[in-house]
From Swiss-Prot:
The keyword Disulfide bond applies. Gene3D superfamilies: Cupredoxins - blue copper proteins. It is a lipid-anchor; GPI-anchor. It comes from Arabidopsis thaliana. This is Early nodulin-like protein 3. Residues 130-180 are annotated as: Disordered. The keyword Lipoprotein applies. It is found in: Cell membrane.
Amino acid sequence: MGLVMRFDLYLMFVMLMGLGFTISNGYKFYVGGKDGWVPTPSEDYSHWSHRNRFQVNDTLHFKYAKGKDSVLEVTEQEYNTCNTTHPLTSLSDGDSLFLLSHSGSYFFISGNSQNCLKGQKLAVKVLSTVHHSHSPRHTSPSPSPVHQELSSPGPSPGVEPSSDSNSRVPAPGPATAPNSAGLVGPGMVVLVIMISSLF
């Protein structure tokens, strides 16, 4: 009987470690919402960026016409001058994901300098996950953000991406509408089942 109880405790520890790992995952932000990464978005990318709060492990999803545009991660100076000659990172597949792997500022411009000069550029400030909650910021009375939680508790639940330019969905897998507990609810159910199996 002691061996079974030790195994159950070990299994519970492994599950809790797995739950802790999933909580560290971030959100997927659709850059530009329904418009995607375009030269003349319906909402300025600067405004879009300021309405959101980005944290380490979040992902930016750039959707654009493959072969007609691209996304370049650049320095702040290159961002300010729309200089496309020395990018830090170049994305060109038309459906690009960029992981925000550390806190600080990131700068993105179109691979077409003329598009950048028209406003197709994005600056993102990434906050540390340790000291800040993960919720959208609103600087103006705009429509409620449409988003979904990946696995950490945070902003209120939403629905699938719509016309709102503040759309966020889980990074992996198809979008589904979570309950008010987000994805922590299933983790709690597993934990309760595991604890009850000990008795």
